[in-house]
Amino acid sequence: MATPPRAVARFSLALALALLATACGSGGTLSAKALSQEAKTLSSEAAEGALLAQDGAAGKSTRIYTRVHSEDLYKAAAQAASSLQKAKTTPALGPKLRRTARLAQKVSADLKRLGHASRTEQRALARELFAAAKELK
């Protein structure tokens, strides 16, 4: 039996928040491992959003499903983007943190648009989200 997509999105959000809380707790700095895990989680959310956009554009998923699932993905990505904007890290990891935070903002914005996008827009969003997923790896 497959795991429902909403459960996967909720688990991903909980995992990302736990990692950021652990990494940033008590005024500490975000570790390289936590930053890499955050990028991996965002990459997964972007890839899932891209597949959702492709299916929506091809008429393989309903507009309601696309809207609801993209909202779940958006919430997870928006929370990660917010946390990354506030995060601190070592100077050596600063560029990676800024890049990951910028991509998190973009993924979040794309996922928010996806829920109400036309099929043409969904095709463009699929390309953008796949590119973001690849860049986050």
Question: What residue spans do the PLM features occupy?
Answer:
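Short, exposed beta-strand-loop hairpins at the edges of beta-sheets
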Residues: 116-124
